Amino acid sequence: MLVSNGGTGSAHEWDRTTIDYDIEPSSDTHAIEISSNDDYLHPLAQFKKSEEFDEVPTNTLIHEVPSFSDSASNIQSQRNLSPFKELEIVSKKKSEQTFSSAVDFSAINVKNLNLKSGLFDPEPPSYDPDYAFNQRSLQSDPGSDEMFRNFKKSISLEELKSSYKLASAEMCEPETRLSFLQLALQAEKSSSRRNREYVARKKEEAFDYLTSFVSQGNSFFGYSEALYLLAVCYGTGALRTEINEKEAYRLYKMAADLNHVQAAYRVAICLQMGFGVTQNTEEAIHYFFRAASGQHVGAMHRMALIYFRGLMSVKRDPVKAMYYLNLGALEADHEFPQALYDLAELYEHGSSYLDGLLELSPRKAFVLYHIAAKYGLKDAQLRVARCFELGQLECDINLVRSFVWYRRLARKRNPEAMWKLSQFYLNGVDDVIYPNPELANEWAKAAAYKNHHLASTFVQDVGKEDVFEKTSITISNEERKSRNSESLPKKKKRLSMLSFKRSKNRESCIIS
């Protein structure tokens, strides 16, 4: 858990912070299994690039969040107001050097970060945005396989059947059936084959529920949600629906006009990318702003990118950009963690170009990288692994933790992580991971298959000569077999001696 002393303003005294990993021995000597709260981690979607934003495919999903400001309804009622004039509501005084009058950071929910509101400095940035936001960090808002952020991470088949039983009753409330439809759409995207097969058997009935809800008009509370779910079906092919981008956009637009936050974000994406409608960047900004006003994390991050780089014919404004980036970082979660990563880059590079309003802070950068890594962002996981490996960002070197992060990322087929994991297996990690040249070669081949240059060279050298004989860490096959045959109690005892037993595994990394 990351803890601060709750200071306010831009000057903080950070307490000593501990980052916990419960490392348990595995039956495989060359692997460390961790027991943590990272079960929800999943590979993030990687999208292709476009001219102004990373391209978002039509099946990108958006997520409902509650409104945090009464200003959202006021803004939405001002239909004749230009989007550029609307944006002036966010920052009334462009020349202000602080956001204290624009937003009350103490009132923002920071439960996702387990931090008090004093973490993020609310001063405007002073740096070259083109330097801080490199091409890698300008990737699209990462999505997940989950449809709605307020859903559980997984659904059991029994829960799905129980929900259907309630929804199929004759005197069923519309909200009950709507809840089943939400679960069905999520289960269809899950990794459980039984869940997918069950939804496939009920897809026609579920689609009939949706169409009946929409045909009733705005006569029940969940009408906007039903419109959105039906739009998801037409836009992504859910419930085996034939994809129809024009119909999906029409339904998204109807839901957005009823103040549905995710639908507003989806309409903005459609207008920006031209999915089912003619491209209209001015209207896209209007809907991005509406979604951001409804506290949609992805929309807040998009607005930050627009102002940082001056995209879509909008004048570059670092003050407004930093406002949205701070909000996006405060509300970031496992579906939209990118704002954390971008803010970490700013703290890592510091204000090298203007008045020094955003000071260099490696400690805060590491905290933000680590939170984004816990949320599953691949770039952040790679950065955290390097920090533990090389002692960067004022972090103590810890090869075991570095190995854990590299291995987690290597399982997602990241070539750099696979190459690093190969080096760890080649050289070993203290007395926890024994050298294993064969396994090192396998991971190097996997990285080479992904066109990693160093891994390709390494594999070619292995084919020409016995590289492993030149290393000082090579162990004999007999010794390796002897180590692999250690009983589980012996492994636990060995890990305990190295202070990696569950009850004692609380190594500290000073971040202040």
UniProtKB/Swiss-Prot annotation:
**Sel1-like repeat feature ranges:** 224-260, 261-296, 297-333, 337-377, 378-414, 415-452
Give the way it sits in the membrane.
Answer: Lipid-anchor
Q: Which residues carry this modification: Cysteine methyl ester?
A: 509
InterPro entries given in the database record: Chitin_Synth_Reg, Sel1-like, TPR-like_helical_dom_sf
Which residues constitute the signal peptide according to the record? none
Superkingdom to which the source organism belongs:
Eukaryota
User: Where is this protein found?
Assistant: Membrane
What positions belong to the pro-peptide in this record? 510-512
Which SUPFAM superfamilies does this one have?
Answer: HCP-like
Lipid attachment (S-farnesyl cysteine) is at 509
Q: Which GO terms describe its cellular component?
A: cell division site; cytosol; membrane; nucleus
Q: Which Pfam families match?
A: Sel1
Keywords, ordered alphabetically? Lipoprotein, Membrane, Methylation, Prenylation, Repeat
State its role: Involved in chitin biosynthesis.
List the protein's name: Chitin synthase regulatory factor 2
Say which species the protein is native to: Schizosaccharomyces pombe (strain 972 / ATCC 24843) (Fission yeast)
Q: What gene is it encoded by?
A: chr2
